[in-house]
A protein has these predicted regions:
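Domain-scale selection of a single, long terminal region
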Residues: 1-4, 24-26
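Bacterial N-terminal signal peptides
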Residues: 2-12
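Sec/Tat signal peptide C-region and signal peptidase I cleavage site
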Residues: 13-17
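Electrostatic cytochrome c docking/interface patches
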Residues: 19-52
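Second-shell loop/turn segments in exported
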Residues: 32-35, 78-79, 122-126
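Gly/Gly-Pro-rich "capping" loops immediately C-terminal to redox-active cysteine motifs
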Residues: 39, 48, 58, 62-99, ...
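Short pre-active-site segment immediately N-terminal to redox-active cysteine/selenocysteine motifs
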Residues: 52-56, 64, 132
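C-terminal capping alpha-helices of c-type cytochrome domains
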Residues: 88, 92-93, 109-145
Length: 145
């Protein structure tokens, strides 16, 4: 039920229809190449992570964003993410966390295939655009221990 609520909230975000889908290649445990062909903006990525209407990351994760209260405790702390994973590994986790844990409650923010119970209005549309994914990856990569 929680997963359904998370996905429903994410699918209602305005960013959903903002981007054309771009192909990506998974190499082992990462997507090495940027989805946009350029680096993301860490400041925009931080804003996406903190925004409870766009990324909803803090619904489940805790992160080094002290001005945001009531952060989640269902998923790993985002602090130190840039020390634990490469940009490519972070990218794949945001694009499709199910690659690492098939029972995760984290929705695939960019994958649109093989999803269950998606309303027609949201079918074949990623939750975050390629640019937003790259911005989030750029921000998470700055979070070093």
């Amino acid at each position: 039920m929680l997963l359904g609520a998370i996905v429903a909230a994410l699918l209602a975000t305005p960013a959903l229809a903002a981007d054309v889908r771009r192909a990506y290649v998974v190499n082992g445990d990462e997507i090495k190449a940027s989805l946009t062909g350029r680096a993301g903006d860490p400041a925009r990525g931080r804003a996406i992570v903190a925004n409870r209407q766009v990324g909803l990351c803090l619904l489940c994760h805790t992160g080094p964003i002290p001005e945001e209260r009531f952060q989640g405790d269902l998923a790993p702390d985002l602090g130190g993410a840039g020390s634990r994973w490469t940009e490519g590994q972070l990218r794949l986790r945001v694009v499709d966390a199910e690659r690492f844990n098939p029972t995760t409650i984290m929705p695939p923010y960019f994958r649109t295939e093989k999803l269950a119970r998606v309303a027609k209005a949201f079918a074949d549309k990623p939750i975050l655009s390629a640019e937003q994914i790259e911005d989030v990856v750029a921000y998470l990569a700055t979070l070093k221990d």
